[in-house]
């Protein structure tokens, strides 16, 4: 028999590409014989195939392209997934999770057997997102740039709903894949020979013991900040005309990025551990003009950052992740004459900011807190619109994103101005405790 916990984790990782409820057999009657498993997997595929909803398209006027860029060799190389305004809307064929090792990494993160990762890659490794792979960049204007930092156990590809949404409104978004071993999986090439034959060196998530958690997480957030700055430097080098080599051998012509980025309009954005990375990197790199921290994990944030972070900062929190202690730490960033905003999305959970909220079925998504009470599309739409309004103000954009200025103030039926604890009628439950290894 398969334990109930394993079935639940299996459902989580299945990431059904359409929101479609279906019924699992009672665990006591579960048969693990290969012939029976084959028929059960067939039924799962059939259930998924009859659905209709997945990662949303951007709501802006620009077609969206996507590519991967890697500069240099070894584990200090720069690795980003780039979302950008495209010349034309080609096939929406960007693979969501492109290598089976990422599924293996997710199984490590969740503590399940590696065979689960293999099965999930077989079933869902071809799931695509609504962006055109290697489509030519739309030329003729300079774009603002957003560097994005992923959460613990995540990687560069699973924030496509945010990346695509922002790119469809005229941003270039570079999602960094971190090499601090906070990603479920990542890879690099040791040298040019390895890159030529695609001999990848894989790094998997580091399991951190409780007694070493504080020191390790603070080291990781510092490395993550350096990696965000390093990614920014590499992209700006290309913008200045430096002919860098993409060691991935992509068909995307990087020369298109020359003179395509307005380096006075650069922001930093991140989710959870990536939100903590936003706070760290802003304090160290003034090229980032402002930051958006999505439900930041405050555990690794050093107190010295409170007064060192000078740029405007927007916190967008979920309703059920933060503790009063976490909110108190965020409010210590409220310094005199410094722009600080905080809003909370009602009925949301921590995973409402990443793609898993869209690609998991309704029943499983709600049971495993991948979905909140709020519709996932409404939550991500509020996130993107509030972010764009904030970015327009502080990057000096000549757009119409100011129509969403009320969202930055929490003026919407689905928003709370300030923290979850500022709503008299809402008492949020805690998903995790500070310092937990399941934080994201």
Swiss-Prot record:
Glycosylated position list: 59, 75, 199
Post-translational note: N-glycosylated.
Traits of the deletion mutant: Mutant mice show increased susceptibility to neonatal necrotizing enterocolitis in response to formula feeding, bacterial colonization, and asphyxia/ cold stress.
Keywords in alphabetical order: Glycoprotein, HDL, Hydrolase, Lipid degradation, Lipid metabolism, Phospholipid degradation, Phospholipid metabolism, Secreted, Signal
Entry's Gene Ontology molecular function annotations: 1-alkyl-2-acetylglycerophosphocholine esterase activity; calcium-independent phospholipase A2 activity; phospholipid binding
Catalytic activity: a 1-O-alkyl-2-acetyl-sn-glycero-3-phosphocholine + H2O = a 1-O-alkyl-sn-glycero-3-phosphocholine + acetate + H(+); 1-O-decyl-2-acetyl-sn-glycero-3-phosphocholine + H2O = 1-O-decyl-sn-glycero-3-phosphocholine + acetate + H(+); 1-O-dodecyl-2-acetyl-sn-glycero-3-phosphocholine + H2O = 1-O-dodecyl-sn-glycero-3-phosphocholine + acetate + H(+); 1-O-tetradecyl-2-acetyl-sn-glycero-3-phosphocholine + H2O = 1-O-tetradecyl-sn-glycero-3-phosphocholine + acetate + H(+)
Localization: Secreted, Extracellular space
Catalytic activity, EC: 3.1.1.47
Record protein name field: Platelet-activating factor acetylhydrolase
Lineage, highest ranks first: Eukaryota, Metazoa, Chordata, Craniata, Vertebrata
Gene: Pla2g7
